[in-house]
């Protein structure tokens, strides 16, 4: 009976689904560039058994640890758009060159932080759920994420004590604060056996956060950038729609609405009414560009990335359930439709003050060429928001924190403004997807926000300045400012130390040989002396040098004495002078990071000489 019960248990779905970290290990990835494979894990984790809800993740281990361990969770928006956008077009270590080739991203955020990309909500990207079970509210989305993290940290407990940051862009401006609130609540309600998660900060790029402030900014930005000519027939039509939007926003019930139909129509009409005779319209994600889709097929990397992720061998490498994930699309319209069918929750702007006051730092950043979530709307929401005893960027009543000009390696990069644990960064010449345009500049920004200290690692720091004042040192992955340069120096020091240690050991061995030969010769000489005196009738013999040795010896005592010497030497063979003299502490003392130089080198990526440049040519109205 017991045997049958055991057999049933082993064959049960619960047992079959039990997995370990090893099951998620990514052994290799198709098209990977030359060099060591980064340490990766990927696959599905169940978050809702009743609806077959599973979230897909792709995790990259950091290449270096600066002063402490950090994990950054990245989420794209939509709603319903895959975080593989962030992994392969923005902040991840690889970019897709074509559908069969990956290249290193010079400016990836994984140098000092573990990266965890999650396709969420269920049904997004490689995640899946029963077709009638898409989510309708942000509380449910947040609950799934907390469940996911509980299971993920149980699988990978070495990361549970990391400083935790949640980052993303666009409609993730709604996801991120709601998920952060759920984590703060979870930390307050856990029992003594559970570990609180160290939520340190949030980073939101071109985020959809405050509809009340951001809907009106569409026409403000269009006029400011010359997309619409004031007084024109197009302007008249759009102004009428914008007035209808303003009336709806004035309705008290709209204060808690994330999506307002009358306001959504303004952007759609702007795209339609400004279409050129060549049937091109402005790219809503990068106004420097025009194309027939108004940016819905932008950026150019999207097509090869889609073909890459649809390859069978790629899905196999990422440990995907083949029966559930037959393909990949960037955005699942059904996920977005169901989340926007009704109001999914309170606008995230209302959550930010409590999060900041609870000790969570927040960084908002914007690319100045984005229309759909433009910087004017973000700046307006900050201006109106009240937190920590002040309004906006007040440092004291009536006095606002200054905008500090930011230069990166000699070029005007944008500006910083910050007060009371909120930081805002504007990027010049940047689109809706800022890390796509400026990977190294965003890496510089994130390293400073998460307080990376490279003092114990080395490398030539990037030249990053605010108002001409050089900022604390950090390195940003190119040949002139990277920790890889320091790694090479450490390796050279290690090799030099090893050769010195080997030489020292060789000298010690030579000394041992010389001493041994000398002692051996001495005893041979003494033995012969005793043998030559053995014929004297008055001999008393020699006292043994070993305790317990006979006082009277014959002519054969010389050989016996030498034999005892050899035996004594063999008995002490374990006391290896060479081994004693090879002090590995010398190697450890070279630098605090040198002990792990070999291990770090396994994950160091060869740097490229490419400089950041604006990405153009090529062209969603989803918020990615």
From Swiss-Prot:
Cellular component terms per the entry's GO annotation: membrane; trans-Golgi network
Region (Disordered): 461-491, 533-624
Any Pfam family hit: Peptidase_S10
GO molecular function: serine-type carboxypeptidase activity
Lineage, uppermost ranks: Eukaryota, Fungi, Dikarya, Ascomycota, Pezizomycotina
The protein's Enzyme Commission number: 3.4.16.6
Chief place of localization: Golgi
Record field: compositional bias (Acidic residues): 606-615
UniProt KW Transport keyword: no
Stretches assigned to the Cytoplasmic side: 526-624
Catalytic center residues: 170, 370, 432
InterPro entries for the chain: AB_hydrolase_fold, Peptidase_S10
Organism of origin: Talaromyces stipitatus (strain ATCC 10500 / CBS 375.48 / QM 6759 / NRRL 1006) (Penicillium stipitatum)
Stated name of the protein: Pheromone-processing carboxypeptidase kex1
Localization per record: Golgi apparatus, trans-Golgi network membrane
